[in-house]
């Protein structure tokens, strides 16, 4: 079995903890830049290629700035994600707006910023025209329905997903949009999540490239770009094989040359919207073991909880755990590693074989750089933790402070309880 190795040493982490108390999310700048460059290299054969980082995965302006410096754009799905991306400096075509059940205010802001809009439904054409206007460049999201399979292995069930247009709808949508003055069209689809296979993108590309040729023939539309969206996953478990993004890029190139080039569409730009692949391995949740409990099972209680990393609780997802300083110790103790929420599913690991854990040990929970902090919440009155960046020079920078009681009570800044709660928030233990 291969090993997952933390991107920080025990000595480094102890120094960080002396300044920033656990729990916190820690990100690796060098790893983020390395991953971005690898993705750009994998698709460098396509002159118009651009990776649009899925902001929903890790919405932090400091991290977005790193990705912007590496040539990435921003994939936004909400009003505030648009605002954050604009504040960082992403402009117009550097932002892709992909949303569903979209509020009018979101569309209005997207048009004000002149970003590329990806329409989720054919009815959104009239809705967008009513609340704003129809731009010259529009993308449409496609859902082929049925089950999506690779080599007879079902990857996901698009037919049960709420996203995208049917085959008939997207053809009709192109005709309508063209009649309303749209000059440049894009196609987008997301058919499977967290795939750990080099075949996903090439198979998705085949579906979208064939659709692009058909749309050109049936509507006369100019297909400017095709967005392969996300779905490229990571190996959360040590025994899993990582995706080879260079092989993935080469696989897409072969399909591109097979289908689009002969159709006179060799100038089509390719986009991706990778969130998990870009950030998950380059981030971790760091927590301290603060309690041991010996009942019917052995429990290790941490100062982090599902409010800091929700995936194990709601999806049963595996996140590898390294007990810092005990990387080479035998994994001969079986633990449930838990947080302090009043929910029995608040567990980072169940029946996990780990080295003996003592109170005060630092636990490095791997692959929490995406869908970690971003899915946090305040149930049980828990406060969201800080986010820190391990910079390339080895220094550490706080890129989001930890929440305080004052933050938690901030939305009661009216009426009789506002002043009382503000006073409570000032009390220091």
Indicate where each model-derived feature is located.
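Conserved, mostly hydrophobic/aromatic
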Residues: 32, 56, 78, 110, ...
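Glycine-rich, aromatic-flanked loop segments that form ligand/cofactor-binding clefts
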Residues: 133-147
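Active-site loop/helix belt of alpha/beta enzymes
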Residues: 144-290
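A charged N-terminal "starter" segment
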Residues: 1-117, 122-136, 175-179, 183, ...
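Charged (often Lys/Glu-rich) extended helix/loop segments that serve as interaction or gating elements
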Residues: 257-261, 265-429
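Active-site-proximal loop/turn and secondary-structure-junction residues that shape catalytic pockets
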Residues: 57-59, 80, 101-103, 121-123, ...
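Structured core elements
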Residues: 73, 96, 116-118, 139-141, ...
């Amino acid at each position: 079995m291969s090993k997952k190795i933390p991107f920080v040493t025990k000595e480094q982490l102890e120094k960080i903890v002396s300044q920033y108390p656990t729990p916190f999310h820690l990100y690796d700048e060098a790893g983020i830049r390395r991953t971005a460059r690898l993705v750009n290299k994998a698709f460098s054969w396509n002159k118009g290629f651009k990776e649009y980082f899925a902001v929903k995965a890790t919405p932090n302006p400091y991290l977005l700035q790193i990705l912007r410096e590496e040539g990435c754009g921003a994939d936004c799905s909400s009003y505030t994600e648009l605002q954050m991306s604009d504040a960082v400096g992403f402009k117009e075509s550097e932002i892709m707006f992909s949303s569903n059940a979209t509020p009018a205010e979101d569309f209005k802001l997207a048009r004000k910023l002149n970003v590329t809009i990806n329409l989720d439904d054919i009815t959104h054409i009239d809705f967008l025209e009513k609340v704003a206007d129809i731009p010259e460049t529009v993308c449409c999201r496609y859902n082929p329905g049925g089950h999506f399979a690779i080599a007879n292995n079902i990857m996901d069930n698009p037919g049960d997903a709420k996203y995208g247009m049917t085959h008939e709808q997207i053809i009709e949508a192109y005709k309508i949009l063209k009649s309303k003055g749209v000059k440049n069209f894009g196609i987008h689809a997301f058919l499977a999540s967290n795939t750990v296979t080099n075949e996903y993108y090439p198979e998705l590309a085949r579906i979208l490239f064939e659709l692009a040729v058909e749309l050109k023939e049936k509507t006369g539309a100019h297909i400017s770009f095709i967005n392969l969206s996300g779905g490229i996953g990571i190996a959360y478990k040590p025994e899993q094989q990582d995706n080879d993004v260079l092989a993935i890029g080469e696989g897409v190139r072969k399909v591109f040359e097979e289908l689009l080039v002969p159709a006179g569409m060799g100038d089509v730009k390719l986009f991706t919207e990778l969130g998990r692949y870009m950030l998950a391995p380059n981030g971790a949740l760091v927590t301290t073991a603060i309690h041991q409990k010996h009942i019917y099972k052995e429990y290790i209680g941490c100062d982090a909880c599902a409010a800091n990393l929700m995936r194990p609780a709601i999806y049963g997802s595996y996140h590898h755990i390294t007990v810092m300083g005990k990387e080479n110790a035998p994994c001969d103790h079986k633990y449930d590693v838990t947080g302090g929420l009043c929910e029995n599913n608040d567990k980072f690991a169940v029946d996990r074989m780990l080295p003996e854990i003592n109170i005060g040990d630092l636990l490095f929970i791997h692959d929490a750089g995406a869908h970690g902090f971003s899915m946090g919440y305040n149930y049980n009155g828990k406060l969201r933790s800080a986010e820190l960046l391990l910079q390339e020079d080895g220094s550490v920078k706080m890129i989001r402070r930890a929440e305080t009681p004052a933050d938690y009570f901030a939305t009661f800044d009216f009426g009789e309880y506002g002043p009382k709660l503000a006073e409570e928030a000032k009390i220091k233990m």
